[in-house]
Amino acid sequence: MKVAVLGAGAWGTALAGHLAARHDTLLWARDAALIAGLQARHENSRYLDGIALPDALRYDADLGAALAHGAADDALCVIAAPVAGLRTLCHAMRDAGCVPAHVVWVCKGFEADTHLLPHQVIAAELPEQQSNGVLSGPSFAREVGQSLPVALTVASVSAECRERTLAAFHHGAMRIYTGDDVVGVEVGGAVKNVLAIATGISDGLGLGLNARAALITRGLAEMSRLGVVLGGRAETFTGLTGLGDLILTATGDLSRNRTVGLQLAAGRTLNDILGALGHVAEGVRCAQAVLALARAQSIDMPITQAVCGVLFDGIAPRDAVSGLLRRDARAE
């Protein structure tokens, strides 16, 4: 199978390395200097340093060439750009005049200005693209790059897209499950990043494991409430792309969103934290979108509201926690 991966950040690079072990894989980035470094060293020293990439993996800064590779009869196109750049990439794909027949995206979050999920952005910008889906689940790029075991879910209403994605990714240490709840999978992948900031704050303040468990459990309830109202199925949120991804992102030290929370608890400013990270922390980007959607639907999401207060309203982390503890008692 031919596979084109669009986006050479940490996640796109790790997935391309996995795919290249079995398939004819081309990794694209618009940054010619990044591509030149990949070609010279077979390592993404900018985003995934220390991980050797397969010799068979090829690289290109020409979007047209990458799209042509991913548009072959027996091919798959993987969109690994962050949500913030998804619409721009779709524009470029359309302008290139070559939209692959089978597309799967791996980005997580809501578009900041429109509050749209990735599938809604793609439907608006590439309406002719019908065989598509989302690949998501509890996963750190570095561990995938190290070929450590991982389980992901592809969700699509297209059986052909599910089967093609399964054929591409299900090998080696990667196990793929299939489903059709695109909305549920996307909401889980977005909201868990916001909740991971909350658990990072709690852990950074030294509030203990009991508090962490409470935040994860009540955070899952927030995720499910929003997801069901937006069209997802309740059972999706207890699976890999909901609870599974939440547990990993909230507790794993490779989590950028958890790191943001830890650093906020230590008294650092958000600008300093993001500057030091040098990578995307999607929870920061989509927290306001999640809260706006919740308010528009009259959904109670107190943990998300507390995170937004710390990130954007100058509320001290310890005061945000105190506010949660002062909430009225209620039935679970």
UniProtKB/Swiss-Prot annotation:
Major localization class: cytoplasm
Enzyme Commission number(s) from the entry: 1.1.1.94
Gene3D superfamilies according to UniProt: N-(1-d-carboxylethyl)-l-norvaline Dehydrogenase, domain 2, NAD(P)-binding Rossmann-like Domain
Pathway given in the UniProt record: Membrane lipid metabolism; glycerophospholipid metabolism
Catalytic activity entry: sn-glycerol 3-phosphate + NAD(+) = dihydroxyacetone phosphate + NADH + H(+); sn-glycerol 3-phosphate + NADP(+) = dihydroxyacetone phosphate + NADPH + H(+)
Residues spanning the signal sequence: none
Compartments, record wording: Cytoplasm
Sequence positions that bind NADPH: W11, R30, K108, A141, R256, V280, E282
GO biological process: carbohydrate metabolic process; glycerol-3-phosphate biosynthetic process; glycerol-3-phosphate catabolic process; glycerophospholipid metabolic process; phospholipid biosynthetic process
UniProtKB keywords: Cytoplasm, Lipid biosynthesis, Lipid metabolism, NAD, NADP, Nucleotide-binding, Oxidoreductase, Phospholipid biosynthesis, Phospholipid metabolism
SUPFAM superfamilies: 6-phosphogluconate dehydrogenase C-terminal domain-like (SSF48179), NAD(P)-binding Rossmann-fold domains (SSF51735)
Record: residues binding sn-glycerol 3-phosphate: K108, G137, S139, K192, D245, S255, R256, N257
Catalytic residue positions: K192 (proton acceptor)
Protein family membership: Belongs to the NAD-dependent glycerol-3-phosphate dehydrogenase family.
Function in brief: Catalyzes the reduction of the glycolytic intermediate dihydroxyacetone phosphate (DHAP) to sn-glycerol 3-phosphate (G3P), the key precursor for phospholipid synthesis.
Protein name: Glycerol-3-phosphate dehydrogenase [NAD(P)+]
Gene for this chain: gpsA
